[in-house]
Amino acid sequence: MLSVLTTAGTGRAQSVMTLHDCMEYAVSHSTKMRIRSAESGDARIARRDAVLAVFTPQVSASTYVYYNFGRSIDPQTNTWFTQTSFHNSYGISAGFNLFDGFRAVNNLRISATGLLISESQEKQAEADICLAVMEAYCNVLYYKRLDDVYAEQVAAAETVLRKAEREEELGRRSHADVVQMEAELAERRYESTNAHNAYRSHLMTLSDLMFWPLEEELVIDPQVPRLPPEPLRAESVVDFALTHDPSLRIAGWQVDNARRELSAARWQLLPSVGLYAGWNTSYYTYAGTQTSPFDMQFRNNGGEYVQLSVSVPIFNRLQGHSRIAMKRNALDRATAVYDQKRRDVGSEVRRAVQDRDGAAVAWRQARSKAAVQEEAYNLNLKSLEQGLISPLEFRTANNNYLKAQADEMNSYLTYLIRQAVVRYYGGVDYLDQ
């Protein structure tokens, strides 16, 4: 687990954010996660609608009111008359598809898979955000460390310059050496300024990824996260990823949906059967005549019906066959995408393991080089103070020391990220590391 050496503070504005804190904050405030969450909500609604379409009928009620002026038919005598009349009707009906080519059943299965796809896309978005935050966080740590190293170099150069100026006054150091040391100090100050600017820039990038409030300063833990446990074997990681990788599972579910849509298109060539039932009643009056009261007409004019409907597709300009052909092509595309995605995931995992192993070797070498260069730097610093080497020779040793420090930090953080990626492919979410 990617633990950190210090803990966060109590207030958010003054708290020290660890790597885990930054990833957690980014996931909970990311607009991408909000979009994915809304899409998952749509998928759940589609799932609910598909369930209702299979198990519940369609029910509707209607009513209308109208006045008739002029010639019309008397509903009592079924003869024409010219009196003004008032009509009011009420009805309720229900319908249920007994057989629709299994369209509703297939839609139910497709919606269930669609919900799984949406939830996996949400998890994939979470992983992408965590990885981006991790990389940005490591960049901030790298440039913060570089900034601190250059600040130490500036302080050391100032100390050496002051000592050289005193030695010049005593006649033990030439003016040319002092000028070279002043130039060295100016160079170190310039590099320190650049490193500090880069640190602030990468800190702003991290803040943007986290959606951190603009009016608040982001303070991260300067301690470097510890290394994860022993690396996982390549084959075990590949086997797990080919079964559980979100993008590959999404591609597999899309193949399943394409196959179901092809089956549904074929079933649409068969007749559809529906059962319908309803009840209606009416009320009417005529100007200048006596009619039955509303409650009596409401009861007496009521009627019911039951309808069995069979629809047989005969000729629809080959639209059914065209739909089948298009769904078959969609299945071929989905299968090809799945095969390509499976190959890509396998290659990505193997490359990630290879990058992790290479980063581990590079880090060990950089650590050894940094230790040697640090010892050489300390010896050269003493030699410079004693006047045994020139400032130009010391600059070369100092540059080698700075480069070794930067390489060690960079290789360590690179190994940290590569190991986290491999562990993610092995089934450990970034937030759980």
Language model region names:
Residues G11-Q58, S62, G70, L214-D256, ...:
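Bacterial Sec-pathway N-terminal export signals of envelope proteins
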Residues Q14-N139, V273, A277, L318-H321:
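Short flexible linkers and secondary-structure junctions
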Residues R34-A38, L52, T84, L98-E126, ...:
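Sec/SRP-type N-terminal targeting helices
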Residues A125-L242, D355, A359, Y401:
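Periplasmic alpha-helical coiled-coil/stalk elements that build and connect Gram-negative outer-membrane
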